[in-house]
Structure formats: C-alpha cells, structure tokens
UniProtKB/Swiss-Prot annotation:
It comes from Salmonella typhimurium (strain LT2 / SGSC1412 / ATCC 700720). This is N-acetylmuramic acid 6-phosphate etherase. NCBIfam families: N-acetylmuramic acid 6-phosphate etherase, PRK05441.1, PRK12570.1. The lineage of its organism: Bacteria, Pseudomonadati, Pseudomonadota, Gammaproteobacteria, Enterobacterales. Pathway: Amino-sugar metabolism; 1,6-anhydro-N-acetylmuramate degradation; Amino-sugar metabolism; N-acetylmuramate degradation; Cell wall biogenesis; peptidoglycan recycling. Induction: Induced by MurNAc 6-phosphate that releases the repressor MurR from the DNA. Repressed by MurR in the absence of MurNAc 6-phosphate.
C-alpha cells in the first residue's frame, strides 16, 4: 500500500505555513481543524449505534469488550477501558485495552510492534478469547497489521468485530462486521494522527463504552449509579446522586448510603420505595441491576 494516498497522510492546504505563523494564528488554525471532527463523527452515528448494541449484547452474554490498536489508537483504547471500573463499577477485565508492544508501549513507542499480524492474534489468544467477546480494532490509517491480525482471528473465533478508522474503505473495515470511519480529513500537521484522528476515535470510544453501560443497567437517568465511591470526591458525588434522583435531603441520603456501603442504586431504591437495604438489593438482582425496572415493577 502507498501510504501517501491515505487521507490521513495527505497535506492540509489550510495549514501549509504553520512554521511562519504567530502563535495566536497557529492555535486558531488547529482549532478550526478540530471543529470538523464532530461532524465527521456525526456521519458515522448509525454504525456507532450498531457497535453500542453489539457491545451491550457481548456484556449481557458474559463476554468482554476488547479494544486493540497501536500507538495513539492503542493508548486511547487502554484509556477508555481503564475508566470503566471506577465509572460503572464493573470488574477489571470486563473492558480490555490491548496495545501493540504491550504495556510498555503506553509510555514509550515500541518501534515495529504494529507491523506483525501474528502479534495481534497472539495477544487475543493470551486473553483466552471467547466467541461472546466483542473485539474493536482501532487504527487511524485503517491498515495496521497488528489490528488486521487481531480482527481476522477474532472473526475466525466467532466474535463480532468492529473497526474504527479515519480513512474510507480501509483494510480493517473489510475485516470487521461493523465499520466506523469518521473521515476527518488531512491533519493540521501532516500525518500526525494523534490530532483530529485521535480526537475522533476518542469520541467514538466514549459512545461505545458509555452506551453499552447504559444498556447494561449501569446508568439511571443520566447518573452513573454503579460508580465506586472510593475517595472523598466520589462519596460526595454518590450523595448528590441520591439527592438528585429522589429529592430527599443530604443527611438522609448519607444515612441511606451508609446502610448500602455507599452503593448508590440500592440507596435510591430504598428512598423511593421504603425497602430496607437487603430487600432493595434483592429487587435489583431480580431486575438484572436495572434501577428503572426495579422502580417500575
């Protein structure tokens, strides 16, 4: 493949004079390019919605969401995966981020790590990939061998696969059941896909993980009601969530949370139904953890 033909590798005619610009104009040019990203992502929303439903289906069937990528794309997957346990109260390992070259590549580039299809397959084998898992391949270029190898192995293993790329009709898109391709155009700095392409991928990942967790019962209204209250800030947030969801006072909310070990969902259910902590937990379990269903039935 001639990489120079990729949209993400071409030169941007709006930024040909970066090195001659005064700083205010320099940052203005970057900002003007960034405004294009949301529209590019908007054009992919039907495919993002399919990916959200596939991710939720994977979780409901006992599977995992597995991101894999190289460089910036890999780091973004690891970032999104690492935020899921504290935000949604899910166990570590339910959402996984793989980066070509292993964990060391998060901090320092591992040259050549992305060029092996076999490495992508091997990393999934090491995770004991199961057919109920969802594998999301991330590559701004859309042609990273590590990701192609992983997606190919995942499909052969019976997994649903998603490809996120910033070039149209990319090789990884052809390897996946669902292709999400926000075409953000040439980067302000030629070929530096940590810029618009990275922003677009982050926006897509935000929707996939958050949307899947909504469908998995981890959200009530727009509150992260399965959040783990592990520090002072989060204990305060837990109290505010109970107050906002129920209309009770702060002191009463704190008293309920102390009875639930600061778990928000049973505290809200207790406040709105009069159940005790044990009964609230039992009712939530009967509705697979969906707070709205527990309140309505």
């Amino acid at each position: 493949m001639n990489l120079g033909t990729l949209v993400s590798e071409t030169r941007n005619p709006q930024t040909m004079d970066l090195d001659a610009l005064p700083t205010p104009e320099l940052v203005k040019r970057f900002n003007e390019q960034d405004t294009l990203v949301a529209e590019a992502v908007k054009a992919t929303l039907p495919d993002v919605a399919r990916a959200v439903d596939a991710a939720a289906a994977a979780l409901k069937s006992g599977g995992r969401i597995i991101y894999m990528g190289a460089g910036t794309s890999g780091r973004l997957g690891v970032l999104d995966a690492s935020e899921c346990p504290p935000t949604f109260g899910v166990p570590h390992g339910l959402v996984v981020g793989l980066i070509a070259g292993g964990p060391g590549a998060l901090l320092k580039a591992v040259e050549g790590a992305e060029d092996s299809q076999q490495a992508g397959e091997d990393d999934l084998v090491a995770l004991n990939l199961q057919e109920q898992d969802l594998v999301v391949g991330l590559a701004a270029s859309g042609r990273t061998p590590y990701v192609i190898g992983g997606l190919r192995y995942a499909r052969q293993s019976g997994c649903t696969t998603v490809a996120v790329s910033c070039n149209p009709d990319s090789p990884i898109a052809r390897e996946a059941n669902i292709a999400i391709s926000p075409v953000v155009g040439p980067e302000a700095l030629t070929g530096s896909t940590r810029l618009k392409s990275g922003t677009a991928q982050k926006m897509v990942l935000n929707m996939i993980s958050t949307g899947a967790m909504v469908k998995f019962g981890k959200v009530y209204q727009n509150l992260m009601v399965d959040m783990k209250a592990t520090n002072v800030k989060l204990v305060d947030r837990a109290c505010r969530m109970v107050v906002e969801a129920t209309g009770i006072g702060r002191e009463e909310a704190e008293a309920l949370l102390k009875q639930t070990d600061f778990e928000v969902k049973p505290a809200i259910l207790m406040a709105l139904t009069g159940l005790d902590a044990a009964a609230a937990r039992e009712k939530l379990a009967a509705h697979q953890g969906f707070l709205r269903a527990a309140l309505e039935h």
